[in-house]
């Protein structure tokens, strides 16, 4: 096939420009590998797709393509039994939101059957799952109290117990009989336990468990006996909290695995290609 004309047309620069706006690696690679078609029918069909997208761009404005790169791999891992993290589930929710945006964009104006119909109809938004994930997970390292009734109840117990401990210890550090043994009148945390800083020479005057010693050895951090049981309850609640978070992640991961084929987003790749061509 004669290709010298491609250099004259600077096709490589045109394709590179079109690829700049691709939202995922696969669609970018597919577009960069694009070669001129010899089959007139394929050329005609590709032009019809580009014309259809261009017409919709004029009517509806630009669609919002969000990042979806890597989501198919996450879904595949979910199918194999891997548990997705909070950050990974937020990526999944973002992809689902992207699918919904594209479907809404495509249907925002009336039109007859188009050669791009199959591409957009192949997208299957899951607004329920997307909203559940977005409501339950606030950030890659933060799950909302309202993610489940059990989680909400555990966190209320943790906060109530922590407040009770702080009140007791703050009362202790303000007490004249006790404060004279302290390096300073503060309450801190060591190894997940609330402690007070006791002067080393008075370590025997404050009954409790030593959890840490300052670098100089002048201060020992003591968990007073009065709050040992409450501190233990907090650790128990924290362990139950971690178990509940894991249970929620497993449940969401199972829902992602159930719709794994939709995350292969081959349709999104094909949508991206004629859309980027229409911008040239």
For each feature predicted by the language model, list its residue ranges.
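Extended, Lys/Arg-enriched charged tracts that mediate electrostatic binding to polyanionic substrates
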Residues: 153-202
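Conserved amphipathic alpha-helical "coupling/scaffold" segments
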Residues: 1-154, 262, 266-276
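SMC-family hinge/dimerization module
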Residues: 186, 190-221, 231, 276
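Signal for well-folded cores of large energy- and translation-related assemblies
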Residues: 19, 76, 138, 166, ...
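Internal alpha/beta scaffold segment
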Residues: 225-251
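Intracellular alpha-helical coupling/juxtamembrane segments of multi-pass membrane proteins
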Residues: 154, 158-161, 241, 245-248, ...
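Coiled-coil heptad-register positions
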Residues: 58-61, 107, 169, 173-176, ...
